[in-house]
From Swiss-Prot:
Coiled-coil boundaries: none
Organism whose genome encodes this protein: Human papillomavirus 5
A biological-process GO annotation: symbiont-mediated perturbation of host ubiquitin-like protein modification
Designated name of the protein: Protein E6
Record-linked SUPFAM superfamilies: E6 C-terminal domain-like
């Protein structure tokens, strides 16, 4: 077993830059369909199913590379991670368009993820939050809002 550990290749920064960051890009690099990709969750170890693999890419999350082993994050662990980060690293809350004052950027230029599922908010979702005066939270030096799917959990339709 020690012999195997000695022969494991370590990733250099150059190697990391060349590895795929999305499941779709990984499947393309391997020449297989996305449905055939079996990628374990970094947190729970379960393999992502096809829907979770598609959601992972839709959320614009990045694959995690440990040496030459790849990991992703399943739906349940995305929610758990979002909750943990919010509870541990919360910084501030602003309402609606005040996010522009707090960040010094236009709403069009601010990267915002969902506070519940970690999806990357598109411009329609960001403008919807601004128009409704919904809160944006700064967590771990990044902005969080609410995506169109998760807002239904809050009965905000």
């Amino acid at each position: 077993m020690a012999e195997g550990a000695e022969h494991q290749q370590k990733l250099t920064e150059k190697d990391k830059a060349e590895l795929p960051l999305s499941i779709r890009d990984l499947a393309e690099a391997l020449g297989i369909p996305v449905i055939d990709c079996l990628i374990p969750c970094n947190f729970c170890g379960n393999f992502l199913n096809y829907l979770e693999a598609c959601e992972f890419d839709y959320k614009r999350l990045s694959l995690i590379w440990k040496d030459y082993c790849v990991f992703a994050c399943c739906r349940v662990c995305c929610g758990a991670t979002a909750t943990y980060e919010f509870n541990q690293f919360y910084e501030q809350t602003v309402l609606g368009r005040d996010i522009e004052l707090a960040s010094g950027l236009s709403i069009f230029d601010i990267d915002i993820r969902c506070q519940t599922c970690l999806a990357f908010l598109d411009i329609i979702e960001k403008l919807d939050c601004c128009g409704r005066g919904l809160p944006f939270h700064k967590v771990r030096n990044a902005w969080k809002g609410i995506c169109r799917q998760c807002k239904h959990f809050y009965h905000d339709w």
